[in-house]
Amino acid sequence: MMRLLSFDDSDFGAALGAIVARGETPPEGVEETVAEILEAVRLQGDRALLEYTTRFDGLDLTAAQLQVTAEEIEAALAAVDSESMAALQLAADRIAAFHRRQKTETWLTTDEQDVMLGQMVQPLERVGIYVPGGKASYPSSVLMNAIPAKVAGVAEVVMVVPMPHGEVNPHVLAAAHLAGVDRIFKIGGAQAVAALAYGTESVPRVDKITGPGNIYVATAKKMVFGQVDIDMIAGPSEILVINDGSGTPEHIAVDLLSQAEHDELAAAILVTTDADFGRRVQQAVEEQLATLKRAAIARCSIDAFGAILVARDLEQAVALSNSIAPEHLELAVDDPFSLLPRIRHAGAIFMGHHCPEAAGDYLAGPNHTLPTGGTARFFSPLGVDDFVKKSSIISFSREGLDRLGRSIVHLAELEGLEAHGRSVSIRLKDS
């Protein structure tokens, strides 16, 4: 059962600290295993990739069979019913519409010293997206990662998805088709991250890797960062709900469970100013949990990392939320927009009683790839900016250099960099 605590309880700090710190350290041996896999794929290419695919996924392939064929995609499309395809198309359209509003363009300006300055915005050339695989997989992750890349103008999107024993959810391939993914490979785990980061005979090297995965995938992304860009270091999912005693306890309960069912390390926290409402949510969680297919996973999460916290007022609730910087924040209050200016740190903010977090997971439009583990203090949701790079443009006319050159020389002399200053002064003499 979810713990119910007051801010004044003696064990409040310890209980909250345990929730916030969950999953910070990889289990023993993970980093060593991942390092070994990365090095093997870097040195041996397809040979190591195929060996790990056989060992971990039970899928015995040749190099020629690594890539999903057009025929396999057509078969997947045929296996998806019309209602599911319509829902995927609706989600794709809404995600694309939202992300098109994020686009920035190249710009140039000339200042009062006759110096032209600007910024050139260019898409990355090739991006890799990791999608969890098997039968219990997530087509929404395909849409959320591939569509912003395509909106940004990325020329080639390469997707990797593990197919244990050859099984893949056809909805994942259908989503890839709708999102415009260019190539799909039947690989997963740290070995797939390595293939994308270093390239193999069959899998092209990419400029950036995005997408969720297990602890081995997350650790691999962390280790290859610097040789290739990544979206973020994602940890276990989390939700924090701020409530003022209004609304329906059953609604809040199932919102909390929507995160708890993700995995055993997911965190679900309700901060309410109404202790009686909190107790009703506590009971509703138990009633709802018993009916879930993933009840065992949700039970582990709720018991270990679930909490109902009773705050003195909404100011105290908001302060706690800002200190946690949750991935998902629901403002389940009568007037959510009055609280919004006080929210400093959150990955996504869901406003009011009719906006469950699941709406953002699937088709509201904003990205569901969000910073976790308190990193919303400095990370943002995945978006178009993650798939572009920017170059500064600087153009001095002769007159512009005449006006600013002596100050440039002076600053170079302050730093003792003689050639820097001379590269300007020699031009001033020639003008």
Swiss-Prot record:
Q: Catalysed reaction per UniProt?
A: L-histidinol + 2 NAD(+) + H2O = L-histidine + 2 NADH + 3 H(+)
Answer yes or no on keyword Zinc.
Answer: yes
User: What sections of the sequence does the record tag as coiled-coil?
Assistant: none
Q: Which UniProt keywords apply?
A: Amino-acid biosynthesis, Histidine biosynthesis, Metal-binding, NAD, Oxidoreductase, Zinc
Which leading EC class covers this enzyme?
oxidoreductase
Catalytic residues per the record?
327 (proton acceptor), 328 (proton acceptor)
What's this protein's family per the entry?
Answer: Belongs to the histidinol dehydrogenase family.
The name of this protein is: Histidinol dehydrogenase
Give the source species.
Syntrophotalea carbinolica (strain DSM 2380 / NBRC 103641 / GraBd1)
Q: What is the lineage of its organism?
A: Bacteria, Pseudomonadati, Thermodesulfobacteriota, Desulfuromonadia, Desulfuromonadales
